[in-house]
Amino acid sequence: MRTHPIGTGPFKFVEFKPNESIKVTRNPDYWKQGRPYLDGIDYTIVKNPSTGILTFVAGKVDMTSPYFLQVPLLKDLKSQDPDAICELVPSNVNRNVMMNRDAPPFDNAELRRVATLSLDRRAFIDTLTLGKGDIGGAMLPPPEGVWGMPLEMLKTLPGYDPDVQKNRADARKIMEKLGYGQNKHLAVKVSTRNIPPYRDPAVILIDHLKEVYIDGELEPIDTAQWLPKVMRKDYTVALNLTGNGLDDPDQTLYENFTCGAEGNYDGYCNPEFDKMVDRQSMEFDQTKRKELVWAIERKLTEDAARPILWHNRSGTCWHPYVKGYTPMVNSIYNGLRMEDVWLDR
């Protein structure tokens, strides 16, 4: 399946050259009559984002990979090619912190609370996205997110109070009760995948932890080893990215936070929480279901279950002759069928 995939989509697999390209061709047996419009697609694999921008500006490709561009790169591309059509949209991918709650020192709930109180979410957003990210909980934030907690309500949760200095002062008081202080810091390793979307926020996280007597040492992990390391829970603190398949509480909550779930990488397990997730899943009234989901988000935050740093927005650019492409706002995994795309040239 990795080298000769078979499917029923608008395009059929032709060729895969590792680290070079992927080619697909129009599927004449596609179930939707008259689609796709394109005869095929050649995907060029470009590892370096800056090189990818130059490739686009030079006209060697028709569009960037969907959601390929972070905000600074998007601005760079537009400055070099003002005619490019670009959209920056929510990706339903959040940056989050995982703490190994099954091993010292973060088997202590008070220490997990300290880490939560250390966070300055606005600093992450302003530094890494030029202010274009979104503060939220586990669910995609509004307005694009249907189920996310309103910002004013978020501010009442632990660590979300905009008064970061107050939050950190409270965290230092907890640390002092635990025997730490200015002359005795807690040393931990902060593990993350060794690519910029992971590594850059991990560096900022280390700065934030330092404000509450926790000295973090960055441990960059090769991509091939990252997921196995996470699955083994071979970390103390980890900076991770979580992408959701759609904006729906069942998908997000069951997959990432219930006991034993495949995506529950930090091992959070609370049977009462699982019952809360079941209750919202059975509620037909959307308004009532939202209230149940918001109670769940509060519970996750109070339990410091994978604290969310921010929800990212990612960019896609295409040349004006590319028609029919619509970026999705509920997940980076949707809107990739390309069946409605055509070239006006």
Report each predicted region and the residues it spans.
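Structural transition elements
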Residues: F11, I135-K177, I195-D200
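Extracytoplasmic/peripheral linker and loop segments enriched in polar/acidic and small residues
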Residues: A109-R113, I125, P162-Q165, D215-W226, ...
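Periplasmic-binding protein-like
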Residues: C86, D102, F106-G148, R168, ...
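Gly/Pro-rich hinge or "lid" segments in bacterial periplasmic/extracellular proteins
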Residues: M1-P36, G40, A169, K173, ...
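Extracellular/periplasmic solute-recognition and catalytic clefts
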Residues: V14-T25, D42-A103, V114, R122, ...
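Short, well-ordered beta-strand elements
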Residues: G9-K12, I22-K23, D39-I45, M63, ...
